[in-house]
Amino acid sequence: MEWKTCSFCEGTIEPGCGKKYVKKDGSVMHFCSSKCEKNFKLGRVGRKLKWTNTFKRINRGQ
């Protein structure tokens, strides 16, 4: 089993945990928590939210 990466916050997902969401166009999204899934469905972008690893990675030097 392999570890996955959350499509919203870039957090790690252990094998057997998380949730998989398949969009109508066939692309697959992996979520580590319901918080990430709900924010994605609301149309929010992970790189603009301070609690995500994506935001922390982009704004590391600032």
Curated annotation (Swiss-Prot):
Q: Quote the InterPro entries the UniProt record gives.
A: L24e/L24_sf, Ribosomal_eL24, Ribosomal_eL24-rel_arc, Ribosomal_eL24-rel_N, Ribosomal_eL24_CS, TRASH_dom
- Zinc-finger (C4-type) residue ranges come to 6-36
Spell out the PROSITE patterns in the cross-references. RIBOSOMAL_L24E
Alphabetical GO CC annotations of the entry are: ribonucleoprotein complex; ribosome
Q: Which cysteines are joined by disulfide bonds?
A: none
NCBIfam families attached to this UniProt entry: PRK14891.1-1 (NF034186)
PANTHER family in UniProt = 60S RIBOSOMAL PROTEIN L24, RIBOSOMAL PROTEIN L24
How would you summarize the oligomeric state and partners of this protein? Part of the 50S ribosomal subunit. Forms a cluster with proteins L3 and L14.
Per its record, how is this protein called by name? Large ribosomal subunit protein eL24
Please state the gene responsible for encoding this protein: rpl24e
